[in-house]
């Protein structure tokens, strides 16, 4: 960043501080990951200069012959990765991918069945503070109070009762596998479209470690970061018959020019995900997640559902008399980054919460294995049991520094 350092030291210094934070902290936010240097290189390329409204071969501007190559690469790799007939890689985010799908088949006021936010859903699955909850009549399904897992009989009952035009499956804080085939059965029974938001598990799906929703869903949306380990962005997958309508929903429906430098980075990330090494990485994610859950529970920390089938798990802090807000703050002070998170049947506000969400995708990218992640579990447990013990917290902070130094991040930057 020699040019930036010379011309705008304030921005340069802030970026260097963030690099230092990422290197020094144990990153456990489930929606974050560390992209490769080549993904970052593509994002910082001259493609950021090019406006390219429309789609390859059908642009509203001239000079798009080379960015067309890039977008075609991204689309083809995405289709190969997930076995899809159609891919749109232009959505700027997962939220906009979801919006485009809604815009394609729903009218304002239509009924949609989605997962309760505090039970693990997402803002765009019908939260009243989000466009989805404002424009459409969302009704909710959730998890069982005893198991904290989705009960498909309850989902079916809700679908039969409300007769939604669409059912949304997928979650932002659900640690167990989701049965998309079962959702398809329920959707067919009530004549509903099925949209699956696989943003959190897309990498695991690509690696064959979670049921692929693409054969079952009418529409599959995802982000391109998280477990897929690409740049921040969105994507839509569907059958070829939806190409014209979905393309129109993205442009000119809800977006203007695509971000060609980000699409290039998506293409690079998809190329990485097609390699055998990516499957090995995702297998390690699962092992690390299970080991972390096991370690936390062995140290008297409550893990919802008793474990995890994916990259994340939810910690219930109520037995410890703690809030997510307090735990997040103190963990961050010792160099462990998590986020406060509501848990099913929450009694606290979303700004306080009774839980924290932890994910292992980023630390697994960094090279953490089961031995390292067991140490992380012990460190988290010590903090949660000693939230006001300065001596213990100082010791944990020192051990965090030792651990992160063993796994260098971006040494060439």
Swiss-Prot record:
Enzyme Commission number: 2.1.2.1
Main location: cytoplasm
Keywords: Amino-acid biosynthesis, Cytoplasm, One-carbon metabolism, Pyridoxal phosphate, Transferase
InterPro entries named among the record's database cross-references: PyrdxlP-dep_Trfase, PyrdxlP-dep_Trfase_major, PyrdxlP-dep_Trfase_small, Ser_HO-MeTrfase, Ser_HO-MeTrfase-like, Ser_HO-MeTrfase_PLP_BS, SHMT-like_dom
Cofactors that this protein relies on: pyridoxal 5'-phosphate
Site (Plays an important role in substrate specificity): 225
Gene Ontology biological-process entries: glycine biosynthetic process from serine; tetrahydrofolate interconversion; tetrahydrofolate metabolic process
Location(s) in or outside the cell: Cytoplasm
Top-level EC class as recorded in UniProt: transferase
Keyword Amino-acid biosynthesis recorded: yes
PROSITE patterns: SHMT
Annotated positions binding (6S)-5,6,7,8-tetrahydrofolate: 117, 121-123, 349-351
Cytoplasm as UniProt keyword: yes
Modified residues (N6-(pyridoxal phosphate)lysine): 226
SUPFAM superfamilies: PLP-dependent transferases (SSF53383)
Family: Belongs to the SHMT family.
PANTHER family from the UniProt entry: SERINE HYDROXYMETHYLTRANSFERASE, SERINE HYDROXYMETHYLTRANSFERASE 1
Function: Catalyzes the reversible interconversion of serine and glycine with tetrahydrofolate (THF) serving as the one-carbon carrier. This reaction serves as the major source of one-carbon groups required for the biosynthesis of purines, thymidylate, methionine, and other important biomolecules. Also exhibits THF-independent aldolase activity toward beta-hydroxyamino acids, producing glycine and aldehydes, via a retro-aldol mechanism.
Protein name: Serine hydroxymethyltransferase
Lineage: Bacteria, Bacillati, Bacillota, Bacilli, Bacillales
